């Protein structure tokens, strides 16, 4: 009998994507993050669905409904803690996934890369609107500060901000629409992730060496299903450790106070995964300039394929580029730290220097390093 998984219209797609998929034999653990992101998305959709059954998107009851979930709903505390910390795990995997793509030159699969950048932006938007929903102090003021950035757009800015708010400030209408956005966006992310995979399977996976792996491929199952399962166990271990032992470690204490438009918290800051972009935004003493820098800090990923000057795809055998890559990593960690600090010296100047270095590394130093490595590899006789 002909194998059903190879003939059935639906099973055939799954078979070509996850079972009989020819995969390079040398891809390392850095290639696990795609599947981990898929798992994170499923966890977030499921926990979010059950939270939405008990949540009310009204300014008067939103905060108390979240408290009710944690106190009165069966395992509601667990759902909330998994959902909140699941977002942190999602972004951790995202940053490592993007970093892997930059290090090994995966961005040369341009369609896959561009869809990936759109996915990153969509996930960031989802996390932002989701953070507003508990309607704590930091939820409210975070929403106020970030949506206010729209007003920096010349001519149409104020109209745009008020249109976004559904009034003259962040209020009931804003909360209701943010809940609607937060519910629909994960499904858009799922659709985009499928397109991301579709483009990836047009070319096949890249590999650490950066050379064409067609001569040496193995089936995805059982080799990489078992390898992904190990990554999954580690992900769940970290998520459960966070959610069960220290659920509020990555949150902000201000969010335990209900939103109060008359009382501004001393330090308005977003969740840790936005701090690098927030630091870049704050490092420019001009509203519009800051907004443009904020956008550029993410959208710069779209032009990385155009800035590839090296003759080799991967950084595996390029020590100068490797050094710059790790400087970039350290720089992003520095920006994340600065984003969580108050706006005072020496943090202001450190943030400005780190922001300048971020753009300098990506736009100038890394392309130059590629050219230099090409020159060094040329035979000199």
Curated annotation (Swiss-Prot):
The record's annotation in Pfam families points to: Cytochrom_B_C, Cytochrome_B
Q: How is the cofactor bound?
A: Binds 2 heme b groups non-covalently.
Residues annotated as binding a ubiquinone are 201
The organism's place on the tree of life at top rank: Eukaryota
A GO cellular component annotated for this chain's UniProt record is: mitochondrial inner membrane
Residues that hold heme b b566 according to the record? 97, 196
Q: What does this protein do?
A: Component of the ubiquinol-cytochrome c reductase complex (complex III or cytochrome b-c1 complex) that is part of the mitochondrial respiratory chain. The b-c1 complex mediates electron transfer from ubiquinol to cytochrome c. Contributes to the generation of a proton gradient across the mitochondrial membrane that is then used for ATP synthesis.
Q: What is this protein called?
A: Cytochrome b
| Species this protein is from | Neophascogale lorentzii
Q: Which gene encodes it?
A: MT-CYB
């Amino acid at each position: 009998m002909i194998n059903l998984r190879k003939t059935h219209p639906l099973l055939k797609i799954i078979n070509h994507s996850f079972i009989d998929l020819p995969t390079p034999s040398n891809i390392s653990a850095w290639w696990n993050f795609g599947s981990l992101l898929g798992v994170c998305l499923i966890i977030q959709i499921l926990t979010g669905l059950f939270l939405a059954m008990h949540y009310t998107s009204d300014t008067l009851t939103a905060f108390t409904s979240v408290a009710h979930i944690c106190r009165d709903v069966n395992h509601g505390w667990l759902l909330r803690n998994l959902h909140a910390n699941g977002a942190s795990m999602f972004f951790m995997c995202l940053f490592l996934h993007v970093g892997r793509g930059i290090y090994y030159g995966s961005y040369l699969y341009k369609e896959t890369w561009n869809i990936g950048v759109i996915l990153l932006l969509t996930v960031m938007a989802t996390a932002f609107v989701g953070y507003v929903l508990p309607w704590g102090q930091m939820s409210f003021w975070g929403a106020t500060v970030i949506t206010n950035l729209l007003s920096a757009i010349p001519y149409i800015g104020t109209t745009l901000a008020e249109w976004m708010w559904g009034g003259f400030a962040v209020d009931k209408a804003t909360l209701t629409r943010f809940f609607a956005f937060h519910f629909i966006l994960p499904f858009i992310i799922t659709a985009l992730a499928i397109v991301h995979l579709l483009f990836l399977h047009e070319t096949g996976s890249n590999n650490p060496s950066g050379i064409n792996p067609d001569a040496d491929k193995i089936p995805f199952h059982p080799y990489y299903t078992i390898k992904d399962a190990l990554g999954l166990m580690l992900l769940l271990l970290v998520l459960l450790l966070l959610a069960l032992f220290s659920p509020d470690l990555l949150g902000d204490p201000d969010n335990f106070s209900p939103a109060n438009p008359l009382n501004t918290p001393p330090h308005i800051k977003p969740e840790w995964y936005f701090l690098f972009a927030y630091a870049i935004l704050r490092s420019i003493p001009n509203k519009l300039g800051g907004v443009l820098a904020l956008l550029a800090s993410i959208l710069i990923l779209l032009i990385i394929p155009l800035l590839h000057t090296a003759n080799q795809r991967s950084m595996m055998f390029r020590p100068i580029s490797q050094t710059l890559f790790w400087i970039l990593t350290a720089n992003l960690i520095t920006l994340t730290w600065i984003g969580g600090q108050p706006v005072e010296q020496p943090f202001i100047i450190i943030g400005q220097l780190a922001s300048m270095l971020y753009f300098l590394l990506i736009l100038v130093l890394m392309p130059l390093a590629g050219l230099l490595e090409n020159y060094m590899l040329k035979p000199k006789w």
